[in-house]
Amino acid sequence: MNTIKDNTISIITGFQGVTAGGDVTTLGRGGSDTTAVAIAAQVGAERCDIYTDVDGIFTTDPKVVPNAKKLDSITMEEMLELASQGAKVMQTRAVEFANKYNVPVRVLSSFNDGSGTLISQKDESMENSVVSGLSLIHI
C-alpha cells in the first residue's frame, strides 16, 4: 500500500493476500474482486470498477433465461442476497467488504461497452421495487 500512496504504479495480483502472520495466501473464488474492493477502500477511491464476462447484474442468469433484464443499479443488500443465493457475478465476500467500507462497485463487461450495473448503499430507482432479481441453483 505504501507504493500506491506514493503515487507509484503498482502491479497487484488479484487473488492473493497476506495473513496477520505475514504469510502469503490465496483468497479463493472471487478473490480478485475482494482484492480490488479492499484496495479501493484503502486508498479512498470513489468507486471500484469490476470488469467481467457479463454486461452487469441481471434479474436472473441470462445464460439460463435469455430475456433476463440488466439492472442499472442495485443495493449492496440486494446484491448480498443474490450472491449468497448463488449468483456468480460477484463473490459474497467482495460485496460484504464493499458494504462495510461503503465502496460503490460498478460491474462492467470486459468485452462490450456499456454502463454496467452500479452496486451501492442506497438505490433510489429500486425504492418501490418488490423483486430485484432471482438466483438459480442447478441441482
Question: What spans do the regions from the language model cover?
Answer:
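C-terminal catalytic "cap/lid" subdomain
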Residues: M1-I137
